[in-house]
Amino acid sequence: MKEPTKIDFQHRRISQISDFTELLGMLFPGNRNQRYAAACMFCELKWANGMVPNLAYLEDKYGISRRVLQRARAKLTRLGLIEHVSCLNSRYGGQHGWKLSSRFEAGLRQLAEKCSTSRDKTVGSEEKDKMLLGFVRASLDP
């Protein structure tokens, strides 16, 4: 039976995560090679002094193929767990390279806030919600 490749984002599973390897298992459920590459990147970026200019050295150090490394890096970047800083970014004083990012955390906080406000009956109105429901319904009709 083939394993799914989509992120396994279940509330019960989230409460059971105790370390970054389990987090990466949730983010890369169907590809052990990408999970390993992501774990290597995460560990290297976490314990690096400053930014890592290039992640290509991980290919030789950990025996990871370039394609797997690039795909894992792209997914971690899209999720906001890592980010590339340009040398033109004045915030980092001309430094450039890869670093761990807080965008994922900020996005999850915003999502939690949106879920909380959408449940609150004091925010918005029933008429507006029914109108929005009508828009969703209209998008279903061909």
Residue ranges and their predicted role:
Residues 102-134:
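Short, amphipathic alpha-helical interaction segments positioned at domain boundaries
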Residues 1-53:
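Short recognition helix of helix-turn-helix/winged-helix DNA-binding domains
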Residues 77-89:
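A short, conserved structural fragment
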Residues 73:
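DNA major-groove recognition helix of helix-turn-helix
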Residues 1, 137-142:
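C-terminal regulatory/oligomerization modules of transcriptional regulators
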Residues 32-35, 87-113:
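Short, cationic-aromatic polyanion-contact patches
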Residues 51-65, 76:
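A short alpha-helical element within helix-turn-helix/winged-helix DNA-binding domains
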